């Protein structure tokens, strides 16, 4: 059934196909918990079929997809539609994050916990209505979400201040080289620390995506993940493309 049946130095029994993997690493299929497959609404960039195929080429056999598409996945109806799309288009295992907004707490409360992967909260700028910057909305989200809360953490006020500062300084010469100055350590830390504080306040399950600073690491406890309610991750490319 297109699955690995046995890994061994010697295979005596009959097999449909035997692959010699001498000198290679054999690892389980990878799970990517944060992908942007752009379907529906933004398929000129990619879609569920093309991107899941690309993932398989790199060993990713399961994915959790983001809600910042068009229309946004901020309702249970739109979430169900994405699952229907994937049932005929995904080439690997799949799930989808429900997206939070400042106003969709009732949708969050009634989500099927056996369907959605997690609740994605953009605490920094995002597509459409998906920036969650209202503290009362954040309180409700961390208090009532039946799903693990996963966050993109940047303090939008600080980012806007930095944008104005560096635009006044560089004008039209402002470029990607200044990205880390605009979305700086302080903007990330302010938001990540707020998320951690809210998770502790409401005893929520929290996972913070793509940490980018040593300072943020101080918010999390070292050691094995077992039993932890507050966790985080980093992106490998951030380890290489930085100022060090």
Predicted regions and their residues:
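Alpha-helix termination/capping residues and helix-transition junctions
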Residues: 57, 88-91, 113-115, 203
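Active-site mouth loops of central-metabolism enzymes
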Residues: 33-46, 69, 92-104, 130, ...
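Divalent metal-coordination and catalytic microenvironments
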Residues: 2, 23, 34, 55, ...
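Histidine-rich, glycine-flanked metal-binding segment
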Residues: 1-28
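Short catalytic-loop micro-motif centered on adjacent basic/acidic residues
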Residues: 65, 95-98, 205-210
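Short, acidic/polar
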Residues: 44-52, 102-112, 194
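Histidine/acidic residue-rich metal-binding segments in metalloenzymes
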Residues: 106-122, 127-244
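Metal-associated gating/positioning segment near the N- to mid-region
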Residues: 22-89
């Amino acid at each position: 059934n297109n699955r690995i049946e046995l890994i061994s130095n010697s295979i005596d029994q009959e097999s449909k196909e035997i692959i010699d993997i001498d000198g290679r690493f054999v690892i389980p299929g990878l799970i990517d918990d944060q992908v942007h497959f752009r379907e529906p609404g933004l398929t000129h960039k990619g879609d569920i079929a093309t991107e899941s195929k690309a993932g398989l080429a790199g060993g990713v056999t399961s994915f959790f997809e983001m809600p910042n598409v068009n229309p946004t996945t901020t309702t249970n109806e739109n979430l169900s539609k994405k699952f229907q799309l994937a049932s005929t288009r995904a080439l690997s295992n799949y799930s989808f994050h429900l997206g939070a907004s400042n106003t969709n707490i009732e949708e969050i409360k009634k989500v099927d916990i056996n369907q959605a992967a997690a609740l994605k909260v953009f605490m920094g700028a995002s597509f459409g209505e998906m920036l969650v910057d209202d503290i009362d909305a954040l309180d409700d989200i961390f208090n009532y979400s039946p799903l693990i809360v996963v966050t993109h953490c940047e303090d939008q006020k600080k980012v806007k201040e930095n944008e104005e500062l560096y635009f006044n300084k560089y004008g039209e010469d402002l470029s990607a080289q200044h990205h880390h100055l605009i979305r700086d350590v302080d903007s990330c830390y302010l938001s990540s620390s707020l998320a951690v504080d809210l998770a502790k306040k409401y005893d929520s399950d929290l996972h913070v995506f793509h940490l980018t600073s040593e300072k943020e690491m101080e918010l999390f406890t070292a050691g094995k993940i077992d039993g932890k309610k507050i966790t985080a991750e980093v992106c490998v490319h951030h380890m290489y493309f930085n100022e060090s």
